[in-house]
């Protein structure tokens, strides 16, 4: 049997529920965008200021079908737009950026998606606070791959 429908006059008033923190007008709510740009993929991961609570995480590989396009600037832009939209829904209006390359004993240069992900966040209306490079730099590392004579082309 189908559930009974309520009469027109019996509806309770709907409450407005705010998901984000309560702030004054014109005040920015900050989050932290961790952008990890390697040459194989780009991660755009937004957390709260402590870094414990994930708000949204989207990768370039989630946005494009071809494996070769995962690290492309276009995929990074789409990922950043998705993240910015989710942040706005939750009331986050500004982001501190932590940019990271692969690092360690591998390349310390961010991949092709880093620049476009940052630009897409700014163009989506998010205010940018501090930009910091958090690529891991070894003080003395394990031996790098490639052998004694290096990679021969």
Curated annotation (Swiss-Prot):
<dbReference type="GO" id="GO:0003735">
    <property type="term" value="F:structural constituent of ribosome"/>
</dbReference>
<keyword id="KW-0689">Ribosomal protein</keyword>
<dbReference type="Pfam" id="PF00411">
    <property type="entry name" value="Ribosomal_S11"/>
</dbReference>
<protein>
    <recommendedName>
        <fullName>Small ribosomal subunit protein uS11</fullName>
    </recommendedName>
</protein>
<dbReference type="InterPro" id="IPR036967">
    <property type="entry name" value="Ribosomal_uS11_sf"/>
</dbReference>
<dbReference type="InterPro" id="IPR001971">
    <property type="entry name" value="Ribosomal_uS11"/>
</dbReference>
<dbReference type="GO" id="GO:0006412">
    <property type="term" value="P:translation"/>
</dbReference>
<keyword id="KW-0687">Ribonucleoprotein</keyword>
<dbReference type="InterPro" id="IPR018102">
    <property type="entry name" value="Ribosomal_uS11_CS"/>
</dbReference>
<dbReference type="GO" id="GO:0005840">
    <property type="term" value="C:ribosome"/>
</dbReference>
<dbReference type="GO" id="GO:1990904">
    <property type="term" value="C:ribonucleoprotein complex"/>
</dbReference>
<comment type="similarity">
    <text>Belongs to the universal ribosomal protein uS11 family.</text>
</comment>
